[in-house]
From Swiss-Prot:
Gene3D superfamilies: Aspartate Aminotransferase, domain 1, Type I PLP-dependent aspartate aminotransferase-like (Major domain). The keyword Hydrolase applies. Homodimer. GO terms for biological process: anthranilate metabolic process; L-kynurenine catabolic process; L-tryptophan catabolic process to kynurenine; NAD biosynthetic process; quinolinate biosynthetic process. This is Kynureninase. It is an enzyme of class 3 (hydrolase). Catalyzes the cleavage of L-kynurenine (L-Kyn) and L-3-hydroxykynurenine (L-3OHKyn) into anthranilic acid (AA) and 3-hydroxyanthranilic acid (3-OHAA), respectively. Its cofactor is pyridoxal 5'-phosphate. The keyword Hydrolase applies. It comes from Burkholderia mallei (strain ATCC 23344).
Length: 416
């Protein structure tokens, strides 16, 4: 892709192009931040009005039954399941990634303590998203025996970090900064052969790249719905537990929604035999309902078509940045190899924050991550090839003119 006309031609031939019309994208904006917050499905506003106006406003408490609110976490989990290689009754939409990580990690450590008490080490990456590490640190601080969080600095170091004391490997499939993607089947096999349990974080994978959790024989996973799945800001996350583990994994947040019969109101907790045991308290129905609007769009295509376009978009973006912005202090930190790349492209720049603010001011929305990382997410359901061209041209002009040096672009916002 060497001209804007070529980009437009690619858009005309794109089989996913019609899906863009199902998103409410503002005019004059090139949105390359779907890896942080997905765009709004057009159906979401009407769905919100339906839930608030009719189901809540008119149905009131009856809607737990008549509108299917009570079954929503499991029903939507079943709809999400094919996107991550899961089966029915293995996924629940609920809580946040942080809370679901706590549940699963605690359940896995408890399981190992019963069957292999010597195993007390959690292995993860130093570059993992901080909440994963914070949750592990907080959980370790609460346990009454010596546990250890062992961090590796390179994916190649994982085999050497695993030993007969390893309980769980907690790895994020696609790195949030760089977009590096692990080989899920290979990593899972390595971890399981070492006698440890494999816990995946799919925050930057679900809806972005094909995932096959059951095919990889993973032991558990968490993910969010507000990024590539377009569930809306703060939409609930998901938890996956394969059927072979569900009865054996006992999560610590034994709230009433995880009981086998919540409305029996029994004084003693008896966990649900299926994935519902990983629920805790009353669910956020309004925000959860929005998740279905994003899943409705995914039902019109498949992850292989999405992946093909994702790679084409990121290939084009990287090539254009390196040709059109040649001579600028930009360093690609995202892998070039397709099998190691998620659905983003990240570049390091000495003044990355200021450059990104200048881009946003001109309607090209990506985001910034420390240290010095310009991060661009590509969501094939609505990102066009002409967006790639126009975004790079805007970046080139900002760098050539040093427009990023304007004082207002150095002011740090609370969210970057």
């Amino acid at each position: 892709m060497k001209t804007r006309e070529e980009a437009l031609a690619l858009d005309r031939d794109d089989p996913l192009a019609p899906l863009r019309e199902q998103f409410a994208l503002p005019a004059g904006v090139i949105y390359l931040d779907g890896n942080s917050l997905g765009a709004q499905p057009r159906a979401a506003a009407a769905r919100a009005q339906q839930v608030i106006g009719a189901e809540w406003g008119e149905g009131l408490i009856r809607s737990w039954n008549t509108a299917g609110w009570f079954a929503l976490p499991r029903r939507l989990g079943d709809r999400l399941a094919p996107l991550i290689g899961a089966a029915d009754d293995e996924v629940a939409i609920t809580d946040t990634i942080s809370i679901n990580l706590f549940k699963l990690l605690a359940a896995m450590l408890r399981h190992q303590a019963r069957h292999a008490p010597k195993r007390r080490v959690i292995v993860s990456e130093r570059s993992n998203f901080p909440t994963d590490l914070y949750i592990a640190q907080g959980l370790i601080a609460q346990l009454d025996r010596d546990y250890e969080l062992r961090l590796i600095d390179d994916p190649a170091d994982l085999p050497d970090a695993l030993d007969d004391e390893t309980a769980v490997a907690m790895i994020t499939h696609v790195n949030y900064r760089t977009g590096y993607m692990h080989d899920m089947p290979s990593v899972t096999q390595t971890v399981r052969q070492a006698g440890a349990l494999m816990l995946w974080d799919l925050a930057h994978s679900a809806g972005a790249v094909p995932v096959d959790l059951n095919g990889a024989l993973a032991d558990g996973a968490v993910g969010c719905t507000y990024k590539y799945l377009n569930g809306g800001p703060g939409s609930p996350a998901f938890v996956w537990v394969p059927k072979r583990h569900q009865r054996a994994f006992e999560q610590p947040l034994s709230g009433w929604w995880g009981h086998r019969a919540p409305f029996a109101m029994q004084p003693a907790f008896e966990p649900d035999p299926g994935i519902a045991r990983f629920l805790c308290g009353t669910q956020p129905i309004v925000s959860m309902s929005m998740v279905e609007c994003g899943l409705d769009v995914f039902a019109q295509t498949d992850m292989h078509a999405i992946r093909r376009k994702s790679l084409a978009l990121t290939d084009a973006f990287v090539a254009l940045v390196e040709s059109r912005c040649a001579g600028q202090p930009l360093k690609l930190v995202t892998p070039r190899a397709h099998h190691q790349r998620g659905s983003q492209a990240s570049f390091e720049h000495p003044h990355g924050y200021e450059v990104m603010q200048a881009l946003i001011a001109r309607g090209v929305i990506g985001d910034y991550r420390e240290p010095r990382i310009l991060r661009f997410g590509f969501t094939p359901l609505y990102t066009r090839f002409v967006d790639v061209w126009d975004a790079v041209e805007t970046l080139r002009d900002i760098l050539d003119t040093e427009a990023w040096r304007a004082p207002e672009f150095a002011t740090r916002a609370a969210v970057t």
